[in-house]
Curated annotation (Swiss-Prot):
One GO CC annotation: cytoplasm
GO molecular function: ATP binding; lysine-tRNA ligase activity; magnesium ion binding; tRNA binding
Subcellular location: Cytoplasm
Alphabetical keyword list: Aminoacyl-tRNA synthetase, ATP-binding, Cytoplasm, Ligase, Magnesium, Metal-binding, Nucleotide-binding, Protein biosynthesis
Protein name: Lysine--tRNA ligase
Residues where Mg(2+) 2 binds: 412
Length: 497
């Protein structure tokens, strides 16, 4: 039957409920138990055994069989599933002569139903509610996909996530774990004295990252504004103001490409601690990820995309110079000649832009030849100053900064610094970024005079980090695409939407 015909038939059934003086969309239902709780409470009930405990359950009908004078419905709620067993004689005695007929003729898979009865385990071992009375709670008008026959089209799963959640229990579990991960990160930080403070989403300067922002316009102020690309600069202002341990977990927006690792709207947690450096922050990140994995998975060992990853062992720490030398044979440490560095890179198959500096070439070698191979947790340390305008100059290595990125399973998971607090150096770097922006670099950092004014009042030695929540969820749920861990990912509208 075509979908429109099914829709028409179900609308007619809804009207039939009204004819029988039954509202197919009542206002509430008094539920006493969840399906999962009943499954746990009566797990030891033997086959054929019944108890007189009265229960009321409610949920969606996900399976349905009517066999003469008995009916078996599968009911799904937020905690799991349980079978409803209807006996025609019992229903007629409790609800009237036509009640079983209405159940048979006027309900469908996808409807919501409430059922009151007692608990029994069938001879075949299925825990069931032996229904004495039922109530239709919502008549569904469109048919739903089933776990077995329905939703396999990936794009439809993302576009109609509500159907995906109904049809695929594993998807619901992913989002439960995501919520737990977020909760545990906040708990971890709160217990260590960090304070979460919200910073603006609408900004007059979109700074804190190398990214292209989304633009909007404030009508009342007559002002072009941007959606934030990071929370960094406002959180540092808070450190200037006296908050020594501060963080924010929230949405970030970047007007960039979409891939299995990138969504224009995503979630990060940024953390800043005064009187710390990037070594302290690496310790914090390592402890945090280990604690979250233990709570969410019950273990610090996990499997992601076929790779066994150990978060319990000390995370590897290696400089970018050393990593590139180990993986490519190209040793750039101490080299100042960009042309020579370019020849060395091209010898291993990396095409370099004319005029690139040694630092830019080093980073390109890392991205193209090393990044994807970092399966076990690895802190890559000490980045070129050219690509890190907000990180503090390295205390001993010229032209490098005290920056790290954490890679797990070939993905960047965290990015942290010893934060640049020298206002003269910071001004010079932002001026260089402004020149690059004027020359056409859309991802160059904007010149933010207010931020410079803030740190001229004094930013204490500070360590900071941003952790990608979506990628962390991908890791801990073994999800291959970022769209699998964002409830409603960004998609191009279909024709007619």
């Amino acid at each position: 039957m075509a979908e429109e015909d099914l829709r028409r038939t179900r609308l007619e059934k809804a009207e039939q409920w009204r004819v029988h003086n039954q509202n197919p969309y009542p206002y509430r239902y008094e539920r006493t138990h969840m399906a999962g709780d009943l499954q746990a409470k009566y797990k030891d009930l033997e086959n054929g055994q019944e108890v007189e405990d009265a229960v009321s359950v409610a949920g969606r009908i996900v399976a349905r069989r009517v066999l003469g004078s008995v009916a078996f419905f599968g009911l799904q709620d937020d905690s799991g599933t349980i079978q409803l067993y209807f006996d025609k004689k019992r229903i007629r005695e409790s609800m009237g002569a036509d009640a079983f007929k209405w159940l048979d003729k006027l309900t469908d898979t996808g409807d919501f139903i409430g059922a009151h009865g007692t608990i029994r385990r069938t001879e075949r071992g299925e825990l069931s509610v032996y229904v004495h009375e039922y109530e239709l709670l919502c008549k569904s008008i469109l048919p739903l996909p089933s776990e077995y026959y329905g939703l396999t089209d990936v794009q439809k799963r993302y576009r109609q996530r509500y159907l995906d959640l109904i049809a695929n229990p594993g998807v619901r579990e992913t989002f439960r774990k995501r919520a737990l991960i977020v909760r545990e990160i906040r708990r971890f930080l709160d217990e260590r004295g960090f304070l979460e403070i919200e910073t603006p989403v609408l900004q007059t300067e979109a700074g804190g990252a190398a990214a292209r922002p989304f633009t909007t316009h404030h009508n009342a102020l007559g002002l072009d504004m941007f959606l934030r690309i990071a929370t960094e600069l406002h959180l540092k202002r808070l450190v200037v103001g006296g908050f020594e341990k501060v963080y924010e977990l929230g949405r970030i927006f970047r007007n960039e490409g979409i891939s299995t690792r990138h969504n224009p709207e995503f979630t990060t947690v940024e953390i800043y601690e005064a009187y710390s450096d990037y070594f302290d922050i690496m310790d914090l990140v390592e402890t945090l990820l280990r604690a979250v994995a233990h709570i969410v998975l019950g273990s610090t060992e996990l499997v992601c995309e076929g790779n066994t990853i150990d978060l319990g062992a000390p995370f590897r720490r290696i400089t970018m110079f050393d990593l590139v030398a180990q993986m490519t044979g190209v040793a750039l440490a101490g080299l100042r000649d960009g042309e020579k560095a370019a020849r060395l890179a091209e010898a291993v198959g990396v095409e370099v832009t004319a005029g690139a500096s040694v630092g830019q070439i080093l980073y390109q070698l890392f991205e193209e030849k090393c990044e994807a191979k970092l399966t076990q947790p690895t802190f890559v340390l000490d980045y070129p100053v050219e690509i890190s305008p907000l990180a503090k100059a390295h205390r001993s290595v010229p032209n490098m900064v005290e920056r790290f990125e954490l890679y797990i399973n070939g993905r960047e998971t965290a990015d942290g610094f010893s934060e640049l607090n020298d206002p003269v150096d910071q001004r010079a770097r932002l001026e260089a970024q402004a020149k690059a922006k004027a020359a056409g670099d859309l991802e160059a950092h904007p010149f933010d005079e207010d931020f410079l004014t803030a740190i001229e009042h004094g930013l204490p030695p500070t360590g900071g980090v941003g952790i990608g929540i979506d990628r962390l969820v991908m890791l801990l749920t073994d999800s291959p695409s970022i769209r699998d861990v964002i409830a409603f990912p960004t998609l191009r509208p279909e024709a007619g939407e």
